């Protein structure tokens, strides 16, 4: 499944998209500007206590920080079967997840028993960019860009216009 939010721009074509599907990764997304420190929770068996007594929720959390580099979901490609399998395996974590879904997949996609695979940093850059777009566009054109207006420099906008991705 291809996710394209309104602040994303697709630069590639169907053949490129098919190439990413065939590489065997279950989640493609842009590299984050800085590594994202993500905390998950270790959930006890008595999950009902979290909904019944939310004020003591934090007393039962054991945080496990992990730095994630890849996974921005604004322009992302997801294997539906593997995504569902991961959600089923991690359903107790998904029930209490308090952050964006892309961070869930980045975090739990690195350690699971359903063989869910997140594309590595160097390969993720070939799929989608979110920052340092001007420098990376000069190296190789990705399939698309996400949140490009947030980080766009004048040269990036000029490049996108010259190549027909933006109207002049």
Language model regions located:
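A structural signal for short, well-ordered beta-strand segments and their strand-loop junctions
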Residues: 2-3, 27-29, 117-119
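A generic structural signal for short, solvent-exposed coil/turn residues
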Residues: 2, 20-22, 137
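Phosphate-binding glycine-rich loops and adjacent basic patches that engage nucleotide phosphates
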Residues: 6, 43-48, 63-70
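Short beta-strand-to-loop acidic/aromatic patch adjacent to the donor-nucleotide binding site
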Residues: 1-10
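Structural motif
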Residues: 1, 25, 73-75
């Amino acid at each position: 499944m291809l996710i394209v939010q309104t602040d994303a721009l697709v630069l590639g074509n169907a053949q490129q998209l098919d190439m990413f599907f065939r590489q065997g990764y279950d989640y493609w997304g842009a590299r984050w500007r800085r590594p994202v420190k993500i905390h998950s929770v270790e959930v006890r068996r008595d999950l009902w206590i979290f909904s019944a007594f939310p004020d003591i929720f934090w007393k039962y959390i054991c945080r496990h920080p992990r730095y994630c580099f890849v996974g921005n979901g604004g322009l992302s490609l997801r294997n539906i079967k593997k995504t569902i399998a991961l959600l089923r395996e991690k359903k107790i974590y998904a029930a209490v997840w308090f952050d964006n879904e892309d961070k869930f997949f980045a975090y739990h996609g690195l350690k699971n028993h359903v063989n869910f695979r997140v594309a590595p940093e160097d390969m993720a850059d070939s799929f989608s960019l979110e920052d340092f777009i001007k420098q990376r566009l000069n190296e190789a054109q990705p399939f698309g860009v996400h949140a490009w207006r947030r980080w766009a420099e004048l040269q990036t906008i000029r490049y996108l216009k010259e190549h027909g991705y933006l109207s002049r």
